[in-house]
Amino acid sequence: LSQLIRTAFIPSEGNKFVVADFSAIEARVIAWLAGETWVNEVFATHGKIYEATASQMFHVPIEKIAKGNPEYALRQKGKVATLALGYQGGSNALIAMGALNMGLTEEELPDIVQRWRTANPRIRDLWYAVEEAALAVMQTAQPQAIYNLIFNLESDIVYGQSFLTVQLPSGRKLYYPRPFLKENQFGKMAIHYYTVGQQTRKWEVTSTYGGKMTENIVQAIARDCLAETLRRIDAKGLQVVFHVHDEVIIDAPAGTTVEEICDLMAEPIAWAPGLILKGAGFEGNYYMKD
């Protein structure tokens, strides 16, 4: 049904839709933020992150992870690990990402988790650094700066609210309302804060940890990358009619090309030096998933 609903969106008369999104945006952002050098090098060269991840995890030359070779089966493990494990997830994260439907067994999942974390030590360090910085702010009320992020406690005097904030490389901030420290269900001291429950739609308390905060930060930076692209598209005189996650949908004149838009998405961002971005897309007479 959702596929049919998408096709109801059509461009204005005489125009076409140009649809483009970022390729592997979260994998690119987290590697850039953490300084995971080998991942950044993959994105700067061939871009085969699933094959490269499998190569790192299983110590197999990447050239062997190709169709027709028995080692090609490792690509699936590299893919699901890349998609599922960037935010401190374990076996359950792999299962949620469909690992068992990909032919993997539950028994081999802990090994995949361990291999991925060993291959990505700087991303693993990022999780713990984020958690330690947030806890330090809560315990000392002093700002903490790590990885081009600034953690702080801020207050709204007018409304009597307090926030744990994280200033992103762009200068924008994430806000965690009414934060406090309390033991979580695992008996570990953790940050708790108020959020609107997805089911209840009411304010309720939730806890967080390094990996989850890293996810918030990475996805927020990815959003800021999208905002830069929206500005560039607007500066070209083109109209973005809507955007979905990291995807832009442009009501474009016939002469506009997909390559033109992808080039805008790949341009360097001043506040993110060294972040390598890439766009991919298509054009058509109605909206759809590529």
Please provide the spans of the model-predicted regions.
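Conserved catalytic core of nucleotide polymerization and phosphodiester-bond processing enzymes
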Residues: 1-290
